[in-house]
């Protein structure tokens, strides 16, 4: 499930609500924050900030584990933050593509076997990378929050 919208329209709060409700219903849920601010899952894990996939790629190349990318949150909801490029360099959309590829490469979906993956995607940027979860078959439904 992809949730997208313009900034400050309540997308992350909606994603949080979906995660908690689906988790309470017994589903194994993973939320992937796809915003360079990397704050989508903060309310779920309560740690302030977590390492983003792109920070791990930049600082440790490929020398990190799946556990470094996935943080357990409220009720076992799995929290991931894609992160963004170095400010002023790179493309945030390309960063999302890299993060999703890295999760797949490290076996996130096979190991954790989520029933539902919620992608909290920034929707006010004209960039093909932000549509990656839908375009590449990572998600089968998308919702625009207005």
Where are these regions (language model features)?
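Electropositive phosphate-/nucleotide-binding environments in soluble metabolic enzymes
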Residues: 8, 16, 34, 93-97
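Short glycine/serine/threonine-rich phosphate/pyrophosphate-binding segments
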Residues: 11-15, 38-41, 121-129
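N-terminal phosphate/diphosphate-binding loop that engages ATP/GTP or pyrophosphate donors
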Residues: 18-83
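Phosphate-binding/switch loop-helix module in NTP-utilizing enzymes
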Residues: 78-138
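Conserved beta-strand/loop subsegment of P-loop NTPase cores
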Residues: 140-146
């Amino acid at each position: 499930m992809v949730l997208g919208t313009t900034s400050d329209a309540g997308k992350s709060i909606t994603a949080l609500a979906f995660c908690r409700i689906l988790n309470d219903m017994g589903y194994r849920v993973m939320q992937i924050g796809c915003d360079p601010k990397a704050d989508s899952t903060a309310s779920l894990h309560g740690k302030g900030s977590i390492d983003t996939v792109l920070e791990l790629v930049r600082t440790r190349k490929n020398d990190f584990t799946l556990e470094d990318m996935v943080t357990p949150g409220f009720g076992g909801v799995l929290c991931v933050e894609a992160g963004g490029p170095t400010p002023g360099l790179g493309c945030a959309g390309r960063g999302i593509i890299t993060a999703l590829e890295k999760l797949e490469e490290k076996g996130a979906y096979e190991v954790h076997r989520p029933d539902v993956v919620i992608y909290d995607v920034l929707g006010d940027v004209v960039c093909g990378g932000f549509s990656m979860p839908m375009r590449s078959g990572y998600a089968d439904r998308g919702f625009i929050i207005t």
